Swiss-Prot record:
GO terms for molecular function: 16S rRNA (guanine(1207)-N(2))-methyltransferase activity; nucleic acid binding. The keyword Transferase applies. Its EC number is 2.1.1.172. It comes from Escherichia coli O81 (strain ED1a). The gene is rsmC. Specifically methylates the guanine in position 1207 of 16S rRNA in the 30S particle. This is Ribosomal RNA small subunit methyltransferase C.
Length: 343
């Protein structure tokens, strides 16, 4: 997060306008401009744990991570700079939350890549902070308005759910596969053996569907789930509770907050971070797994078939197996042996 995103580069064209402002940065914060822009005061709120990690190192307590922002998170701010995400329901959740807390008269800036659908911000905020486009560059749009009316925000209204083979999956905006089980996860689930025992870690757990499906036919497993996304953490907790499954769920940047070793690590790792394609998380997952697997333990992941994971698996574990595949996806399995690098 050292190079600025195109959206931040557009904002920097207007940096003089922000020098006297007390700014709250929120949304898809993929760089450290909130810590570096010259302002009267800066705060940041994010639902992404890895973004918070970077910003908190430079901003301390002025960078906050949570599902729902509170009045304390926006205190004394007179300007909102919101980075539009690729997911419109996610933007609506975050903006309605923030605008319900900020005082009438707050300056509102919305910036984002055109391909992310940022222009729909105009319609979304029409009743609260009518926006006008004030700049267009780097295939991004920058919109400005002033908060005229606070929306009423109720986080409970954003919950959704769907069923998978009799299990109820709870979801929130911004959670992967919010509207149904994705094909990759289906393929990974098909490979999980009933009556498995031991400690299982689900990395990038999303809504928790892999874990609850696994626990249904292997009730003796002890589950730990983690994700970088605050909505995913809350959705997984709700999914586990709804289905009567026990497990520990917490925010973590891959293994950053994970303690101990496990008998199995399962994952459908992301390769998109916001609008940017990124393989970093999956490579960190593979290389770091050896520090969190017991001897004889296994890493089992599903990935798009075109992604270059076999080389990283072989480099780390000494070998790998493909135990299921379709035209688009492969399920990889690697075992912790003495050949594996100890990280």
């Amino acid at each position: 997060m050292s190079a600025f995103t195109p959206a931040s580069e557009v904002l920097l064209r207007h940096s003089d306008d922000f020098e006297q402002s007390r700014i709250l940065f929120a949304g898809d914060l993929q760089d450290d401009l909130p810590a570096r822009l010259d302002t009267a005061a800066s705060r940041a709120h994010t639902q992404q744990f890895h973004h918070w990690q970077v910003l908190s190192r430079q901003m301390g307590d002025n960078a906050r991570f949570s599902l729902v922002a509170t009045a304390d998170d926006v205190a004394d701010c007179d300007t909102l700079i919101y980075y539009w995400p690729k997911n419109k329901p996610e933007a609506q959740f975050q903006l309605m939350n923030l605008l319900s807390l900020l005082p009438v008269g707050t300056d509102i800036f919305v910036v984002g890549e055109n391909r992310s659908g940022v222009r729909s911000a105009e319609q979304m905020l029409a009743d609260y902070a009518p926006l006008n486009k004030v700049d267009s560059a780097r295939r991004c749009g920058l919109y400005f308005g002033r908060l005229e009316k606070q929306p009423v925000f109720d986080a409970n209204k954003f919950w959704g759910e769907y069923s998978v083979d009799g299990l109820t999956v709870k979801t929130l905006p911004g959670v992967f596969s919010r509207d149904g089980l994705d094909v990759g996860s289906q393929l990974l689930l098909s490979t999980l053996t009933p009556h498995t025992k031991g400690k299982v870690l689900d990395v990038g757990c999303g809504a928790g569907v892999l874990s609850v499906a696994f626990a249904r036919h292997s009730p003796k497993i002890r589950l730990t789930l983690c994700d970088v996304s605050a909505p995913a953490v809350e959705a997984s907790r709700a999914t586990l509770a709804t289905n009567g499954v026990e497990g520990e769920v917490f925010a973590s940047n891959v293994f950053s907050e994970v303690k101990g070793r496990f008998d199995m690590i399962i994952s459908n790792p992301p390769f998109h971070d916001g609008m940017q394609t990124s393989l970093d998380a999956a490579q960190t997952l593979i290389r770091g797994a050896v520090r969190h697997l017991n001897s004889g333990g296994e890493l089992r992941i599903v990935a798009n078939a075109f992604l270059p994971y076999p080389d990283v698996l072989d480099e780390t574990f000494g070998f790998h197996e493909v135990i299921a595949q379709t035209g688009r996806f492969k399920v990889y399995r690697a075992i912790m042996t003495r050949q594996a690098k100890k990280g």
